A protein has these predicted regions:
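Non-transmembrane, aqueous-exposed alpha-helical and coiled segments at domain scale
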Residues: 1-378
């Protein structure tokens, strides 16, 4: 029997069995390896979630200490990857840089010639550790500043923000960022994860799968949406203008990014969590700027009332990242930094029971035709 989604885009088609992540779109539930995302966001660190997705279980205290040490030791970026960033930082867009720099990290990876599971676990750990350093180095270079070296004693989120901003974040900022990373770590069979699994199914290597996934995430219908959300908020400019602007956009049938989701038919649980963190950050924000949280909250009310659409994770991640002092065009690279562990875990899972992913297409072109011998090209 040949199955095809009535709506296209493989919607509703199951393409793999996975132990990593499950979504109940009707109830708004997201689970990583059996753990509800709300519990992980409240109690876990990003490092614990990385361990969970890669190793299958949450770590003990001793395992977590050892794992954090491994991650910290792998943060340093040198060789070709560092040279690539220094060369292109002034001209390359953030996702272009990251796509290229991640590929360059494969050149001197000690396991580059191995594709077994142990090697892929080590590659995954190194990618999780190095991508924040790549992003931080790029941001500092394009600002004309010296890169901030990773500090082994700092946790993932604190170190990441310090490399980006050149100063240590407040504890509340680091925790907010840590939660944002947790929320983006995996999300079942999205476009970039599917891309990674297709590449992995050819028995290609971990870095190739991740670079392909970055290419998929670059698109505005996937990872780039939070940048568009922030640009929309900036264009609106104030809480007082939200009603008029949003209603005009809706009347003109213009899409408002950050609303609706292919899977969720209710509030995206990740958006609900980030909304609370954005609100908390807004209470200590610079009064000279618009209240991005209040603007977002009012936009949510109008779009839900007028269109029946709920915000997705991109919507409140925009104001959250802005409050953390992160440039808008860097937002999608943060998505990569978080999601790389999900991609890597899917690559490992694909390799365990691999079959080449090779679907069919339905031909809708002309019927078979005879070649008109002698009547063409004369």
């Amino acid at each position: 029997m040949r199955l095809m989604s009535d709506k296209g885009g493989l919607e509703g088609i199951v393409v793999a069995r996975s132990e990593l992540c499950s979504i109940d779109g009707q109830k708004g539930i997201l689970v990583y390896r059996g753990y509800d995302i709300r519990d992980l966001a409240e109690h876990a660190s990003y490092e614990e979630v990385v361990y969970l997705l890669l190793r299958g279980e949450l770590p003990t205290a001793a395992e977590l200490d050892s794992f954090r040490t491994e991650l910290a030791e792998a943060r340093t970026v040198s060789g070709e990857a560092a040279q690539v960033i220094d060369l292109i930082a002034a001209d390359a867009a953030p996702m272009e840089m990251l796509r290229t720099a991640v590929s360059a990290t494969s050149f001197d990876d000690p396991d580059k010639d191995s594709n077994d599971e142990d090697a892929n676990q080590r590659k995954a750990l190194r990618l999780v550790a190095k991508i924040p350093t790549l992003i931080g180095r790029y941001q500092r270079r394009r600002e004309g500043k010296e890169p901030v070296d990773p500090v082994p004693e700092l946790d993932y989120a604190t170190n990441f923000l310090a490399m980006l901003r050149g100063e240590l974040p407040a504890r509340e900022e680091a925790r907010t960022f840590d939660v944002a990373m947790i929320l983006h770590a995996d999300h079942e069979m999205n476009a970039s994860t599917f891309t990674a699994r297709v590449i992995a199914s050819t028995l290609s290597d971990m870095h190739s799968a991740v670079v392909g996934a970055i290419g998929a995430l670059k698109g505005p219908l996937h990872g780039g949406a939070n940048e568009q959300v922030m640009k929309t908020l900036e264009a609106v400019g104030s809480v007082e203008r939200v009603d008029e602007d949003v209603r005009r956009r809706l009347a003109e049938h213009r899409r408002i990014m950050g609303f609706g989701h292919r899977v969720y038919k209710t509030m995206d649980p990740r958006a609900a969590i980030l909304k609370q963190y954005a609100r908390a950050l807004s209470e200590h924000a610079d009064d000279s700027e618009p209240n991005w949280y209040e603007m977002s909250s009012r936009m949510e009310e109008i779009v839900l009332a007028e269109k029946g659409l709920y915000p997705n994770v991109d919507f409140y991640s925009a104001s959250t990242y802005h409050y953390l002092g992160i440039p808008t065009d860097v937002f999608t690279t943060l998505f990569v930094a978080s999601r790389v562990v999900g991609w890597a875990a899917h690559v490992i899972e694909q390799h365990r029971d691999n079959r080449l992913i090779r679907p069919n297409s339905e031909y809708v072109g002309p019927a078979r035709r005879a070649y008109p011998i002698g009547s063409l090209g004369s």
